């Protein structure tokens, strides 16, 4: 009822305010904020009282929620675009570990002038308060009522309360100005880290994985920015307060005060040691946190292959190992923090006891004014005494974070960001005319270059390599010497000399692992060049990698890639890349969201979108790294004729890396690399004359090229792609952005859930259920109240001591009992903190374990609809909140409310009439917290949610660094990141503004409480001792009012992190659980593993009317699919790219469940087989090769099931023995994520094949297993497969028809349907069969036909 009245009242107020603000100017910001910050145009009084925040408070209260468009824009001075400029001129070239922190002090401290002034007033009022209290207690102590002037008493009360109010206002303004400064540091550092991420070299990326960078941006930047809130000023301020208050103490109690000060000084080194220990364990915990986050990121990014290999448990155990070490160091950090806290509490009392004992033993009388003034001074001293070690701890804890950020900012960058590299590429070599290669102007010329992936020992390579020829010769000798001395220098390419003619098509080919990708990376400055020169490389380059980089955005946005939309060019690009049919089949046409890394597209579709992006960019130079291997022959021919050789690229410089040698004769220039990295170059005719027999390589008599009489492309017979483009109008592929139905269909990513309203009791109950029983929790909470009650007894005992209430007792009696009371308090304090530590530690441990298992066992649909950055946010920031912050917050909330409760009871016990003002204040307190909490809670929730886009973009850009840099799109992504950071900082900014709003009002309420208590005690309480005690108690409670409500909201905020984690723990699991918490817990419809011991033993596969949908309301990807595979049969699956071939593989592994129909293996419905059993029973060589962080051995045999001999035998079968033997540590060589530091793309495919050969599977599925391998190696691997898999049922998905030509049967898939299924010979005998056309479209037609006839 009371709440309804409040809402009705404030609703009227809100309408009045809306009328006043109708003409309020709107912001031009492009983000979701819609109004300028009210602080900019507010009066001085409004700024001091924070009245400018009131409207936002009212909105949150009346709506019980806040949306993004309710939040004001960030002030221009605090936006990242402004603050990041302060770090632009930082010089990190020296070896000092403190360069960054010095620069921050230099640039940001001048902005803190208002905070410094506010802090000065805090010091002044802190010093004056005890003096005013001394005068007031002196007045109270006057025994003769006739000597007391009521007016004087009132004036003394007002003077005391004025000091209290002045200190409170100064404190709030100090926090506000200080936090704004730290806030600026946070934004500037986050911006700098992202800018650096976009420049990282390949060598730096080995050390700095995306997970580690996320931790640096979230945890380390937060540590640094929090230090610059107030701690950097408080270190000096608190020291000054301690000295001034100790001086005042000496004034009150004489030299006895120095004894207490001495005790305090003696304890400080112990505090410092404990702080250092705690900081040391914090640094270690951050290292393990980095490792854990990196592994988690790897798991989430590669979740599909992990599931297909049934390796979830293996990687969960790997992550758990890092988590255990992280938790161990977190516990030790908290333990030493507890000891430090105990020392502070003990020290504060020992200082008081030693001072009073010395004062009494020296013959002085303990009077009220001395006792309670000293108590107040000690109370005032307690704050800097507690906070100074904490400030020092923050400063010490800052060091590892500063080092981590600084080391990251100092890490090596891609060479293209070096001005020497830029200058070199912009000039043509002056000695070109003396070179026997005779390059023309604007040709790309590489002279005497040595390229390597790893960072050289002397990473200032430009100073080494630029100069005259004599210096270069000396450099060559130096390099060769180093190579002999250090086996870690593994040069992939040495002494490279080549020309890429301008405006021509240059093809690069060679055996797998010969260095083709390394060569093009060297051209664009992505690997290290130790000597020689590269010139003529255009500034404007389009690039496609073997693993296409796709944004989590619409298909159109991926093609445009930041360029303006030109509809005519866009249409031509879609037709040239054969995307028309694919786009028309998508639910939202070209506006369809394609998911992170193109997760809902086939490999061929992803490659064609990457090609379309390159084509649309209209660059001067195009570099394609094996784009044609991912598509079928028909599409490959179309892409070559209409894209690579088409009108949009005509007369442009094109470099094509390919194993598709049927296109070699059409090249203007050819570069052939052998296995030693040596190259031969020339035209097709010149290379034939040099002995390069392409005819023997291609195994065909049909390959010819007559340069003078090249066949005109317009005379070629139209293939099916061209017919499709004529039938399907390209306009049908372009969607209307204003069509709401289409936009809804186009969406893939789900909106991140935001909790609404108050945190319910059940949420707290659920949280504590992870950490303890109800009994343990009850005991812990009770001990907080019991402890504070005992502590309050010690204050009453001081009053008894002062008044000598017990006759005939000496000072030692009072001191003894005082120490006994305090000793009891210390014991209870230790027990309650250790119990709470144990509870929060167990919560963190159990919660992360549950989260990891839940996410790992979630369906693939979950990963399709949630970007990896959003998921990782649960494992980084949210987990950090639970691990680190919850213990501190719960401790402070418990202490605050137990202190408030016991303190208020004490005041009412002494002054019963105080019940009336306290009831009035309680009502006001209730109203304030009701107004404040909704806005504070919602702003903090938005702050948590708006972190996810930052992490998602960081993860995405990290994965696509090469593409982003090559297309020179850094500025676009920096702008997007700056907008994301500003949105997040905006929530953070107004969250603190709301805190200050309520704190200011609560401080005023506290001032009112102090005023009434001191006034009533002064005028109406006859017992002078109790009167003095009530005043000092009211003074001590003043800060608890605002502190308590702020910490309550902080608790709700951290509970929001818990709720976000809990929501992921409760997500549906895929199919039948892989691992149950109870091993006997099996679905009633699931077949137990015990009944499938030897399954499958025949390998018979049957699809019965199978229908597969990736989205509930989308068109089926497989339609009414039915076929049967007999035991040991070899089935080849072919079809146009995007036809549904890989979906067949996914359905066999139940990566996506059948919406209709059945899949049977040896007569058993696989939907009733537990996923762990199903997936571990089928071998897979995936379309995208999968290498995880670890050794070569662990990648081949993660469970240590095989001997060295067996592993080497399988390695030799896949032709990787020489490559692995050339590595320093052989099988123990460490590979980074994706294996980029050790293997080429083709070699990674062979490594995946090695895993499958090693295990004895009855059913094996190969999805484009040799697509990126040269023809010769592919033939050897084909023979290996035939020998090792002869007794296995094999399904082979391939675009190279020679790969599947020996299969027993061929399944031809088109648009998700099985259109042909028969033996190769039978299908060849049908003139118009799809398979017949595919065979004839291949270069190796005669050889394939002969193979079929022989069979």
From Swiss-Prot:
It comes from the Eukaryota. The keyword Kinase does not apply. One of its GO terms (cellular component) is membrane. SMART domains: AAA. ATP binds at residues 510-517, 1135-1142. Residues 474-700, 1101-1336 form the ABC transporter domain. It holds the Pfam family ABC_membrane. The keyword Aminoacyl-tRNA synthetase does not apply. Residues 112-397, 777-1060 form the ABC transmembrane type-1 domain. One of its GO terms (biological process) is transmembrane transport. One of its GO terms (molecular function) is ABC-type transporter activity. The chain crosses the membrane at residues 120-140, 149-169, 248-268, 771-791, 815-835, 904-924, 977-999, 1002-1022, 1025-1045. Keywords: ATP-binding, Coiled coil, Membrane, Nucleotide-binding, Repeat, Transmembrane, Transmembrane helix, Transport. SUPFAM superfamilies: ABC transporter transmembrane region, P-loop containing nucleoside triphosphate hydrolases. It is a multi-pass membrane protein. Residues 701-734 form a coiled coil. Belongs to the ABC transporter superfamily. ABCC family. Conjugate transporter (TC 3.A.1.208) subfamily. This is ABC transporter C family member 6. It comes from Dictyostelium discoideum.
């Amino acid at each position: 009822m009371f709440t309804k009245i409040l809402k009705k009242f404030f609703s009227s107020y809100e309408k009045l305010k809306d009328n006043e603000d109708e003409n309020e100017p709107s912001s031009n910001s492009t983000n979701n904020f819609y109004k300028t910050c009210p602080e900019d145009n507010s009066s001085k009084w409004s700024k001091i009282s924070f009245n400018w925040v009131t409207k936002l408070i009212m909105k949150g209260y009346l709506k019980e929620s806040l949306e993004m468009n309710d939040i004001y824009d960030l002030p221009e001075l605090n936006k990242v675009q402004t603050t990041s400029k302060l770090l632009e001129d930082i010089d990190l070239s020296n070896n000092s570990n403190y360069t960054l922190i010095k620069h921050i002090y230099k640039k940001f401290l001048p902005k803190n002038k208002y905070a410094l002034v506010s802090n000065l007033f805090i010091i002044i009022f802190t010093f004056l308060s005890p003096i005013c209290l001394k005068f007031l207690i002196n007045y109270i102590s006057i025994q003769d009522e006739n000597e007391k002037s009521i007016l004087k008493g009132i004036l003394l009360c007002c003077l005391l309360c004025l000091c209290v109010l002045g200190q409170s206002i100064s404190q709030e303004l100090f926090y506000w100005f200080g936090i704004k400064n730290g806030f600026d540091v946070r934004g500037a550092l986050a911006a700098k880290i992202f800018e650096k991420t976009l420049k990282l070299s390949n060598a730096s990326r080995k050390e700095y994985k995306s997970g580690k960078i996320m931790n640096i941006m979230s945890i380390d930047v937060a540590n640094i920015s929090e230090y610059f809130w107030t701690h950097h000023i408080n270190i000096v301020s608190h020291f000054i307060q301690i000295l001034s208050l100790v001086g005042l103490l000496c004034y009150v109690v004489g030299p006895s005060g120095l004894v207490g000060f001495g005790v305090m000084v003696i304890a400080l080194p112990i505090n410092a040691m404990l702080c250092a220990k705690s900081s040391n364990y914090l640094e270690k915990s951050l290292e393990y946190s980095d490792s854990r986050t990196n592994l988690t990121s790897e798991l989430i990014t590669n979740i599909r292959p992990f599931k297909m290999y049934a390796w979830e448990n293996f990687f969960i155990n790997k992550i758990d190992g890092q988590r255990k070490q992280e938790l161990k160091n977190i516990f030790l950090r908290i333990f030493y923090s507890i000891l430090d806290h105990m020392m502070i509490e003990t020290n504060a009392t020992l200082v008081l006891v030693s001072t009073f004992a010395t004062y009494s033993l020296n013959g002085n009388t303990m009077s009220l004014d001395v006792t309670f003034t000293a108590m107040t001074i000690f109370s005032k001293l307690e704050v800097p005494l507690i906070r100074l070690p904490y400030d020092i701890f923050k400063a010490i804890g800052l060091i590892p974070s500063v080092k981590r950020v600084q080391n990251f900012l100092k890490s090596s960058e891609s060479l293209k960001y070096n001005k020497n590299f830029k200058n070199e590429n912009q000039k043509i070599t002056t000695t070109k005319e003396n070179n026997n290669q005779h390059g023309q102007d604007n040709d790309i010329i590489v002279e005497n270059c040595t390229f390597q992936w790893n960072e050289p020992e002397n990473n200032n390579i430009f100073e080494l390599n630029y100069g005259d020829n004599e210096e270069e010769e000396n450099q060559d000798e130096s390099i060769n010497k180093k190579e002999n001395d250090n086996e870690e220098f593994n040069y992939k390419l040495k002494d490279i000399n080549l020309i890429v003619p301008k405006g021509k098509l240059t093809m690069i080919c060679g055996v797998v692992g010969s260095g083709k990708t390394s060569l093009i990376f060297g051209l664009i400055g992505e690997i290290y060049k130790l000597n020689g020169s590269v010139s003529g490389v255009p500034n404007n380059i389009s690039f496609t990698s073997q693993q296409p980089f796709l944004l989590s955005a619409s298909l159109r946005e991926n093609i445009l890639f930041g360029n303006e939309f030109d509809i005519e060019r866009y249409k031509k690009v879609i037709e040239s890349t054969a995307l028309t049919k694919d786009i028309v089949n998508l639910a939202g046409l070209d506006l369809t969201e394609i998911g992170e890394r193109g997760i809902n597209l086939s490999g061929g579709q992803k490659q064609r979108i990457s090609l379309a992006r390159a084509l649309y960019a209209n660059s001067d130079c195009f570099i394609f790294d094996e784009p044609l291997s991912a598509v079928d022959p028909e599409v490959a021919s179309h892409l070559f004729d209409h894209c690579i050789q088409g009108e949009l690229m005509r007369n442009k410089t094109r470099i094509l890396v390919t194993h598709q040698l049927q296109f070699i004769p059409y090249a203007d220039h050819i570069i052939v690399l052998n296995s030693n990295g040596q190259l031969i170059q020339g035209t097709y005719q010149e290379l034939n004359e040099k002995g390069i027999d392409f005819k023997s390589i291609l195994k065909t008599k049909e390959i010819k090229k007559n340069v003078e009489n090249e066949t005109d492309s317009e005379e070629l017979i139209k293939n099916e792609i061209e017919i499709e483009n004529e039938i399907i109008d390209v306009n049908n592929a372009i969607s209307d952005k204003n069509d709401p139905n289409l936009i809804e269909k186009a969406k893939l990513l789900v909106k991140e859930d935001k909790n609404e309203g108050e945190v319910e009791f059940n949420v707290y109950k659920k949280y504590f259920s992870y950490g303890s029983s109800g009994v343990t929790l009850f005991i812990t909470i009770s001990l907080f109240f019991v402890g504070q009650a005992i502590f309050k007894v010690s204050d009453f005992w001081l009053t008894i001591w002062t008044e000598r209430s017990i006759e005939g007792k000496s000072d030692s009696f009072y001191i003894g009992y005082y120490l006994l009371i305090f000793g009891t308090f210390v014991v209870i304090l230790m027990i309650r903190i250790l119990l709470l530590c144990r509870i929060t530690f167990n919560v963190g441990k159990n919660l992360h374990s549950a989260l990891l298992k839940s996410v790992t066992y979630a369906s693939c649909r979950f990963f399709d609809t949630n970007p990896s950055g959003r998921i990782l946010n649960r494992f980084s920031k949210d987990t950090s909140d639970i691990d680190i912050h919850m213990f501190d917050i719960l401790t402070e909330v418990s202490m605050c409310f137990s202190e408030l409760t016991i303190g208020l009871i004490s005041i009412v016990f002494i002054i019963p009439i105080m019940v009336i003002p306290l009831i009035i204040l309680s009502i006001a307190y209730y109203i304030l917290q009701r107004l404040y909490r909704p806005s504070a809670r919602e702003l903090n929730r938005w702050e948590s949610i708006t972190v996810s886009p930052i992490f998602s973009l960081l993860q995405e850009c990290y994965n696509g660094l090469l593409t982003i840099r090559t297309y020179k799109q850094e500025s676009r992504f920096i702008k997007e990141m700056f907008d994301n950071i500003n949105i997040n900082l905006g929530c953070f900014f107004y969250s603190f503004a709301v805190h200050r709003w309520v704190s200011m009002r609560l401080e005023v309420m506290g001032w009112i409480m102090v005023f009434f208590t001191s006034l009533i005690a002064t005028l109406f309480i006859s017992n002078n001792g109790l009167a003095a005690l009530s005043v000092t108690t009211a003074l001590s409670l003043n800060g608890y009012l605002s502190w308590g409500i702020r910490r309550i909201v902080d608790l709700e905020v951290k509970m929001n992190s818990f709720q976000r984690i809990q929501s992921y723990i409760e997500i549906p699991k895929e199919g039948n659980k892989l691992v149950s918490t109870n091993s006997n817990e099996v679905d009633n419809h699931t077949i137990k593993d015990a009944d499938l011991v030897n399954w499958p033993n025949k390998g018979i596969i049957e699809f019965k009317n199978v229908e597969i949908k990736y989205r509930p309301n989308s068109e089926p990807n497989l339609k009414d699919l039915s076929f049967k595979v007999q035991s040991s049969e070899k089935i080849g699956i072919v079809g146009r790219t995007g036809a549904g071939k890989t979906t067949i593989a996914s359905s066999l592994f139940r990566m996506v469940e059948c919406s209709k129909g059945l899949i049977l293996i040896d007569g058993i419905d696989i939907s009733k087989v537990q996923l762990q059993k199903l997936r571990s029973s089928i071998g897979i060589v995936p379309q995208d090769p999968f290498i995880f962080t670890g050794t070569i051995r662990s990648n081949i045999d993660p469970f240590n099931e095989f001997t060295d001999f067996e592993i080497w035998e399988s390695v030799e079968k896949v032709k990787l023995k020489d490559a692995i033997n050339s590595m320093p540590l052989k099988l123990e060589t460490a590979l980074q994520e994706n294996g980029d530091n050790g293997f080429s793309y083709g070699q990674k495919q062979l490594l995946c094949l090695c895993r499958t050969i090693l295990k004895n599977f009855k059913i094996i599925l190969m999805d484009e297993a040799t697509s990126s391998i040269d023809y010769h190696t592919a033939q050897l691997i084909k023979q290996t497969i035939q020998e090792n898999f002869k007794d296995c049922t094999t399904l082979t998905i391939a675009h190279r028809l020679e790969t599947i030509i020996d299969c027993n049967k061929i399944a031809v898939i088109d648009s998700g349907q099985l259109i042909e299924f028969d033996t190769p010979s039978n299908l060849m005998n049908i003139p118009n069969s799809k398979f017949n056309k595919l065979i004839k479209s291949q270069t190796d037609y005669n050889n394939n036909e002969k193979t079929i006839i022989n069979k």
